[in-house]
Every structure is written in structure tokens, then in C-alpha cells.
């Protein structure tokens, strides 16, 4: 009981700041009109729901969501789905858009995004500040990270995980640690990462999740703001500048529950986004969206159930090994190994296989779609074939990824585009 009370005290003394202003340029047209944290995932969620749910499930009830790039749909989603907290009980989820609070510049980097909200953080009087990445899909108990930070007496703690060296190159901050997990070296997105001791194929990568003692954080941010040569970034500037003179520790990422594999996915490319959604179709997926012990919260639209109609030999409404969300109608069509978000219509004689179909898509009759990502609001013309011939897909103006996933957006179909 004392340990539970100790963790509860730590989480009550913490303010979490989720950095959700990134574009996600490697997702190409999929993020032309939305920030990456606003991107859909798993049939009914958005990426931002995962770090927010981690906060709530970890007992952290004071959260700020920092927004910048094309944030309309993100702000709307957070307001609709996360506005039920009671300020009088010390609970809040606040949206913190770039507003030139300390200069005429917008957020210039991850550190600057926190620096420009120092007054808001200070008003909350936290003992600890947790800075979290808002653009990964993962399940993590932040209370364990907080406890490790407090017990080590660290000034800063960086959450980390082992990734393949080839995957980390140019993509992740990479660190060197001693036997006590104190960080001895840190390099942001190196072309040639240093491998982990005894494992030449793996390296220790930063997850972009940090815990700071509040006053220490403020001191470092103010110093960084006065450095004309700084990129205003935690990985490039703050961490390398403090590891020699201050106590900065690494915290190995682990599952929220014993005997379960930890889940973390970088969905920053079309291929990784498609693959992470496809993994959910397994009978026992690594990310269990049905786990009542660690629910993923989101905005719940009032939608009717999914419906499957027609049972003729040549026109049978059916779905196999798929996730079909509320409001969908499969009308005499076949869906296999696919994720359909809310209010998708698949009309007669069409076949959708191995695809991720975002909300409000209409697939008209006699279409064949496989290995595709169909963006929100697309209307697929009758008889369209997608994913069977990449040269034909490119000729139609669709994008084909490195691993052969075809992306279709409204703009590619000549439909009106803009905020969702």
C-alpha cells in the first residue's frame, strides 16, 4: 500500500506536456492536412489518444498538449474527447498552440515548445515535468518512469529502448550508458549510431519521453534560449549540454504489465503505418485494444452498428480477419484482412483486401483494392483497381511506397481537399 501511495504522490506532483506539433513529412500526402498526432489508427483512434491514455492510466491528470502544424483536427478531437476532466479536482487537459508568448517566433524546436509555455507550467506548481512524444503508438506506464527518476536522484531521465542500428540511423537520438544507466554520451539522429555493449546489431535509442525536476528544466531552457547557435531541441542541444555536469539517466522501456511484451511503434512512414494497423488483425496482437486493464480512450461518436447485407452467391456482404468500425456498411462486398474506420461504405461486387481505409470512404461497385491506404472522405469510382499494378497506380497519380503500399487521397482523385 505504501508503494501505491508513493506512486500516487509522484503522479499528483507531475505535469505532463505532450509535444503534438509535428507534421510527419515521411507520411507524405497523408499529413498534408493534419498533424501526425491527429492521424487515425486502429479503427477508431487517433495517435494522440495513446500518450493521453498512457497519462490517464498512469494516474497523471494534469496534461498540456502542444500543437502547431495544421492543428485544427487535432484540437477539435482533443476538445471533444478529452474535455471531461474536472479542474476543481486538479484535473485538466489543456491545448497549448504556438502563440508567440516569448518572441515573435513560432515553436522553433522541442525545447522551445516547452520554453514558450514556462509560465503555464509554473502556474501548475509541479515538482516534476514530463515531456512526451505525441506521434508514436505505444503503451507505457509513466508511473514507473517517474519512480525511477525520483529514486535515482536524477536531474533528468530519458526513456529509451533498443532498436536495430540500421533503423536508428538518421531517425533516433542514440545514447551511451554506464552500468547504472547513467548517460555518458548522446547523439541526435546519427548516420552511424554506436551500438549497445555486447550487441553490434542494436543501439539504445531515445523515445523522446523525458522527466525533469521542474526548476532544473527551467534553468536549462533559459540557458538554451540565450544561445544563438542552438536549434532549440532536447536531443540536439539540451541533453548533450548537460550529461557531463548533471545527473542524466536512461530508463529502459518496459511493459505496463508483468509477463507482457512492451509495445511501441514508430508509424512515421506509409509502410510502418500500414504494417502497425495490419498487426492488429492478429488473433493475439502485440497491442491489445480490448484490454480493459489499460483502456485506450478517445472521442466516441454516436454511430449505428456496422452492417453486412446481401447473401447471394455472387454478391455476399462479408468481412474476414478484419476490424470493421461503427457506421460501416458492407453491401454485397468482400473485405479481407483490412481495417475499416467509421462510416465506410463498400458497395456490391467490390473486394477490399489487406488495406487501411480511413473514415467516410465510399468504395463504389466492382472495385478491387489491396495493399492500400485510402484517406478519409475518398470516393473510389466504380470499377477502380488499386494495388494490383504499381505502374498503373502511379499513372493515376497515386503514391506507391517503398514496400508497395498504395496511398490514395481526395486530391489524387480530384475531390475537394482541406481540413477534415
Curated annotation (Swiss-Prot):
Alphabetically sorted, this entry's keywords are: ATP-binding, Carbohydrate metabolism, Glycogen biosynthesis, Glycogen metabolism, Nucleotide-binding, Nucleotidyltransferase, Transferase
One Gene Ontology term of the molecular function aspect: ATP binding
Q: Which reaction does it catalyse?
A: alpha-D-glucose 1-phosphate + ATP + H(+) = ADP-alpha-D-glucose + diphosphate
One Pfam short name:
Hexapep_GlmU
Query: What does the entry give for GO biological process?
Result: glycogen biosynthetic process
Supply the PANTHER family for this chain.
Answer: GLUCOSE-1-PHOSPHATE ADENYLYLTRANSFERASE (PTHR43523:SF2), GLUCOSE-1-PHOSPHATE ADENYLYLTRANSFERASE-RELATED (PTHR43523)
Q: What is the name attached to this protein's record? A: Glucose-1-phosphate adenylyltransferase
Amino acid at each position: 500500500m505504501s508503494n501505491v501511495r508513493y506512486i500516487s504522490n509522484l503522479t499528483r506532483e507531475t505535469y505532463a506536456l505532450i509535444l503534438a506539433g509535428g507534421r510527419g513529412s515521411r507520411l507524405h500526402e497523408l499529413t498534408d492536412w493534419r498533424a501526425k498526432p491527429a492521424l487515425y489508427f486502429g479503427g477508431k483512434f487517433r495517435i494522440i489518444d495513446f500518450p493521453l491514455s498512457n497519462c490517464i492510466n498512469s494516474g497523471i491528470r494534469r496534461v498540456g498538449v502542444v500543437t502547431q502544424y495544421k492543428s485544427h483536427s487535432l484540437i477539435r478531437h482533443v476538445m471533444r474527447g478529452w474535455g471531461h476532466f474536472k479542474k476543481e479536482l486538479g484535473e485538466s487537459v489543456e491545448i497549448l498552440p504556438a502563440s508567440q508568448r516569448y518572441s515573435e517566433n513560432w515553436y522553433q524546436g522541442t525545447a522551445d515548445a516547452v520554453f514558450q509555455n514556462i509560465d503555464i507550467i509554473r502556474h501548475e506548481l509541479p515538482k516534476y515535468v514530463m515531456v512526451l512524444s505525441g506521434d508514436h503508438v505505444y503503451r507505457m506506464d509513466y508511473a514507473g518512469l517517474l519512480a525511477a527518476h525520483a529514486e535515482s536522484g536524477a536531474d533528468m531521465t530519458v526513456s529509451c529502448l533498443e532498436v536495430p542500428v540500421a533503423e536508428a540511423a538518421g531517425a533516433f537520438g542514440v545514447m551511451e550508458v554506464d552500468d547504472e544507466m547513467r548517460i555518458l554520451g548522446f547523439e541526435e539522429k546519427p548516420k552511424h549510431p554506436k551500438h549497445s555493449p555486447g550487441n553490434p546489431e542494436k543501439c539504445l535509442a531515445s523515445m523522446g519521453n523525458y522527466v525533469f525536476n521542474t526548476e532544473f528544466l527551467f534553468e536549462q531552457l533559459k540557458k538554451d534560449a540565450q544561445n544563438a547557435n542552438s536549434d532549440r531541441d532536447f536531443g540536439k542541444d539540451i541533453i548533450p549540454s548537460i550529461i557531463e555536469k548533471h545527473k542524466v539517466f536512461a530508463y529502459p522501456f518496459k511493459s505496463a504489465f508483468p509477463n507482457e511484451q512492451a509495445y511501441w511503434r514508430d508509424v512515421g512512414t506509409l509502410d510502418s503505418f500500414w504494417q502497425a494497423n495490419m498487426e492488429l488483425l492478429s488473433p493475439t496482437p502485440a497491442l491489445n485494444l480490448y484490454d480493459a486493464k489499460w483502456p485506450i480512450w478517445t472521442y466516441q461518436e454516436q454511430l449505428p452498428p456496422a452492417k453486412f447485407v446481401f447473401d447471394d452467391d455472387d454478391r455476399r456482404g462479408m468481412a474476414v480477419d478484419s476490424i470493421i468500425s461503427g457506421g460501416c456498411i458492407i453491401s454485397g462486398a468482400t473485405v479481407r484482412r483490412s481495417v475499416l474506420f467509421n462510416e465506410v461504405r463498400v458497395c456490391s461486387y467490390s473486394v477490399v483486401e489487406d488495406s487501411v481505409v480511413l473514415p467516410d470512404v465510399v468504395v463504389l461497385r466492382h472495385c478491387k483494392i489491396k495493399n492500400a491506404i485510402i484517406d478519409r472522405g475518398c470516393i473510389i469510382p466504380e470499377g477502380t483497381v488499386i494495388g494490383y499494378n504499381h505502374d498503373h497506380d502511379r499513372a493515376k497519380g497515386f503514391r506507391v511506397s517503398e514496400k508497395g503500399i498504395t496511398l490514395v487521397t481526395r486530391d489524387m482523385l480530384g475531390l475537394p481537399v482541406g481540413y477534415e
